[in-house]
Amino acid sequence: MPLKGQIIRLDAPAPPLKVSLWWDDNYATTKSDGLLWAGTTEEDVGFDDGITDAARDLIITSAVEMLPYLEEAELVQQTACLRPITPDRAPIIDAGVGPDGLTIVTGAGRQGIMLGPAMGIAAAALATGTEPPVDVSAFSLARFS
């Protein structure tokens, strides 16, 4: 099942953040659109990709606690997305489990954006029949058999 994550985009009254901030399960960062993006939720709600007032309020409260000046920010947009996640919350990185040449790389959830480059390097090695730079056997699809 997927894991839903909601984020908000704010027009902040102060200069943009020059670095991304992470605290607890939350983050805030200024994106190239000039807006401050803050989030996120982790909701096990099946394929429901709708936004909720409760998530908005939770994200805003957390962001304002970390960055009090955001109390004056304007909410520009709230979005939700569905992230692929495995039952054990570890990604799948595997080859040779289907048609020749098929390599499976999925299930990293909200960490996918950070793990993607490393997962891609491992997947490329598996797809070309070479040894990945690190042992990825723990991420085999067979662990769910």
Give a label for each model feature.
Residues 1-101:
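Active-site substrate-recognition segment that forms the wall
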Residues 69-145:
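C-terminal catalytic lobe of FAD-dependent flavoproteins
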